[in-house]
Amino acid sequence: LANILNTLDVEEHFGYMQSTRDFHFNAYDIFSSLVFARAVSPLSKHKTFHDILPSLFKPVDFSYDQLLDAVEFIGSEYEKFVEIFTVATRENFGIETKHTYFDCTNFYFEIDKENRFQRKGPSKEGRHDPIVGLGLLLDSNMIPIGMKMYPGNESEKPVLRKTIQDLKKQNNIDGRTIQIADKGLNCARNILEAIDHCDGYIFSKSVKQLSETERTWVLLENDYTPVYDGSGEID
């Protein structure tokens, strides 16, 4: 990971970005330390700072409060940082956009009150915590090349359509985008939108909720190809 970050050579961009803040720490050093710690053991920022960072090869020369300030700074400018890393990845490793993939997910926050961004919205788990939605665009090799966050109370269906087009335009992508979605985004409008833009889609749907005709078709044994694991068992 350290070699990849060094090859991307984005530290100077972090310096430019943090020049507008009166920080007494290096935001890039904190960012890179968090990346390494996340790969070792994905924990909360508190546990990461106290349990993981001291064991890494880089000395910790910043406080926990400074870490939180850096996280707030990077989060507030996340779209610019994503663009910086996307450009650096394209220049140093290449990005394959003949086919791209797009998916949405949610993040929960254990806070008592909502704010303008962390809002209560639909939850498959039935939770009532405020959430933030995330749309992620991946290249053909599953490398993230674009992302968009939005308030958790917004419907993902229109967000899906707008975010895909915005991210494709921003990254100059004219290839085919495959939309990956569960039943929450599985609607006729999204399917038509994908077809109209010559894109594709993989939408899941509950077999129990299918019509009798569709359920019969899904359960047919023909046209399925067995996939075996290393022991010769069907995977």
Features from the language model and the residues they span:
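Active-site beta-loop-alpha junctions of metal-dependent nucleic acid enzymes
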Residues: 148-170
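A short acidic (Asp/Glu
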Residues: 111-113, 187-193, 212-215
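Short, surface-exposed connector motifs at secondary-structure boundaries
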Residues: 143, 170-177
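An anionic, glycine-rich sequence signature occurring as long contiguous blocks
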Residues: 130-132, 146-149, 197-235
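A conserved hydrophobic secondary-structure block that centers on an alpha-helix together
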Residues: 42-46, 167-170, 180-181
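Acidic, metal-coordinating catalytic cores used for nucleic-acid/nucleotide bond scission
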Residues: 155, 180-189, 207-209
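Short, surface-exposed basic-aromatic patches at helix termini and helix-loop junctions that form
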Residues: 172, 191-200
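Dynamic "connector" segments at or just before major functional cores
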Residues: 1-116, 128, 135-153
